[in-house]
Amino acid sequence: MEIFTDGSSFVRDGKRKAGNALVTAEQVLEAKSLPQGTSAQLAELVALTQALELSKGQRVNIYTDSKYAYLTLHARAEIWKERQFKTATGEPIKHFREIKRLLTAIYCPKEVAVMHCKGHSRDGSKAAEGNQLGDCQARKAAL
């Protein structure tokens, strides 16, 4: 299975709206609005975590256009875990609850590869088309 994840956050009428989506090349698996004020980074983390949880027991390739979510999972999360999710000054890191949830969710699928894809690309590739559908659905969900 291949899942494309996306999060969206923007200001409309003075209020920050947010949503996320999980899609395959053919269908929308989930598209949800998120609480007002949710940042784009948090929306992306939530989408990636939900994709992992949805893939419990399956083999899955997950694509994200978020460097923040991708690098959180691949490079930063284990370091933050070792530091008990604290910054160098001892303050809790941003989004620590969702990052902890992400670190648990990574073990849900039987096999998983999480890959970064370029956002807003129109090169006709499967990754570009999946990302475009995810982006559209995440923006709709935010409204």
Q: What spans do the regions from the language model cover?
A:
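Short hydrophobic beta-strand that contains or immediately precedes a catalytic carboxylate
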Residues: 3-5
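RNase H catalytic domain
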Residues: 7-15, 27-28, 32, 48-132
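Short glycine-rich loop/turn motifs
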Residues: 16-22
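A short, polar/acidic, helix/strand-boundary loop motif
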Residues: 24-44
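Short, intrinsically disordered/low-complexity patches at protein termini
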Residues: 36, 54, 137-138
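An amphipathic alpha-helix/helix-turn recognition signal
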Residues: 38, 42, 46, 129, ...
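Acidic, His- and aromatic-enriched active-site or binding-groove loops in soluble protein domains
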Residues: 135-143
